[in-house]
């Protein structure tokens, strides 16, 4: 029996499950169902916008808890992260949320309840948030709760409270992009690998919210390279969900900024095409590497300027995610992991200069600013 179990587990990791059907003759191969990975966006408040983001490829939104919205989301196959009508902290009154919990907690489209946004910035004590979480759960709420932090290091104080921990970081252009990676790394390392962690990346111009950054004048939207870099820095942690802020908020409406909107659509489409990279497991790896030029070997956050992650997807395939977190061209000299496989740059034929890497040797890999390179492991017979 143990041998059969090990065999089935090996087949499962290869992406196939074999089912013996009574009277069906030989074994039938059935594809493994990919687990749900939220690719979401904030600021979706109407059924019209819901249809628009559905067509764009999003499967999750942050939106209202009302019947018309949730029913439309269910029809489109979209999950909704919704406020219960009150936020944890001062004034968290059951009379404000009890009705919504009764009416919508059972709704199939409800993904989770948005417990509170950035309590660390508002300096709401963790004990109070934890107490309000217990109060909320006591009112028959069965769906998970979500909580958003603005600083990943505060996961040490708030991370154990919600069912789903979310971290936002919006550095463009007033902070180095490497801050995004730093906050996600802090949150993941503190919360641990078992904690559901969602990243929230910037898809807006701070000019629309300029009152929140007094004195800042260098307003602009993230470039496509920056948006892609933040996306894959999140996946490299890895995270269990990825959302973007925001579709519509105040005077901001994302489709009014076509370069950013179409760049985001391109990234969302790429995530669907390479869905095997979603929700990977991070493997232990102490890489041997050098980054040139020497004076650029560290980012503005004093971390390595190229982020390196060794991941394994649900089918057992290994990937190296290598990401330049800076605006500078860099060269990475890297010794690849030796694990009975060769490495190939994803999307490149083996006869290119970066195809067909073999383990155990030092390879020099050039990077443009914010460039993402993914090496895929191929088993050697």
Region spans (language model):
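Glycan-processing catalytic domains of CAZymes
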Residues: 30-341, 345-380
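Bacterial N-terminal signal peptides that target proteins for export
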Residues: 4-15
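Bacterial N-terminal signal peptides
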Residues: 15-26
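A detector of low-complexity, intrinsically disordered, Ser/Thr/Gly/Pro/Ala-rich segments
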Residues: 1-3, 324
């Amino acid at each position: 029996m143990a041998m059969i179990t090990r065999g089935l587990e090996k087949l499962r990791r290869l992406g196939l499950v074999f089912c013996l059907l009574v009277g069906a003759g030989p074994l039938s191969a059935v594809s493994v169902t990919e687990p749900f990975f939220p690719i979401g966006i904030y600021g979706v408040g109407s059924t019209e916008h819901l249809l628009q983001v559905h067509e764009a490829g999003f499967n999750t939104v942050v939106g209202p808890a009302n019947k018309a919205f949730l029913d439309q989301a269910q029809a489109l196959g979209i999950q909704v992260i919704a406020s219960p009508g009150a936020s944890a902290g001062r004034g968290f009154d059951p009379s404000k949320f009890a009705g919504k919990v009764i009416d919508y907690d059972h709704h199939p489209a409800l993904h989770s309840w948005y417990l509170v946004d950035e309590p660390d910035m508002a300096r709401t004590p963790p004990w109070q948030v934890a107490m309000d979480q217990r109060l909320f759960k006591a009112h028959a709420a069965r769906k998970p709760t979500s909580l958003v932090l603005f600083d990943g290091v505060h996961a040490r104080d708030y991370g154990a409270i919600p069912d789903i921990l979310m971290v936002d970081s919006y550095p463009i252009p007033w902070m180095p992009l490497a801050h995004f990676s730093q906050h996600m790394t802090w949150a993941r390392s503190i919360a641990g690998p078992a904690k559901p962690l969602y990243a929230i990346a910037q898809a807006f111009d701070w000019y629309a919210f300029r009152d929140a950054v007094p004195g800042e004048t260098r307003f602009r939207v993230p470039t496509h390279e920056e948006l892609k870099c933040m996306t894959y820095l999140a996946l490299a942690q890895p995270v269990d969900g990825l959302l973007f802020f925001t579709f519509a908020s105040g005077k901001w409406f994302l489709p009014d900024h076509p370069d950013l909107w179409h760049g985001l659509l391109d990234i969302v489409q790429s995530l669907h095409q390479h869905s095997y990279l979603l929700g990977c497991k991070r493997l232990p790896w102490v890489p041997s590497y050098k980054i040139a030029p020497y004076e650029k070997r560290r980012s503005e956050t004093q971390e390595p300027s190229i982020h390196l992650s060794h991941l394994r997807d649900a089918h057992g395939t290994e990937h190296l995610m290598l990401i330049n977190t800076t605006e500078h061209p860099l060269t990475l000299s890297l010794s690849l992991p030796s694990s009975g496989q060769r490495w190939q740059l994803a999307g490149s034929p083996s006869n290119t200069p970066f195809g067909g890497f073999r383990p155990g040797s030092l390879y020099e890999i050039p990077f443009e600013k914010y460039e993402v390179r993914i090496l895929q492991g191929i088993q050697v017979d």
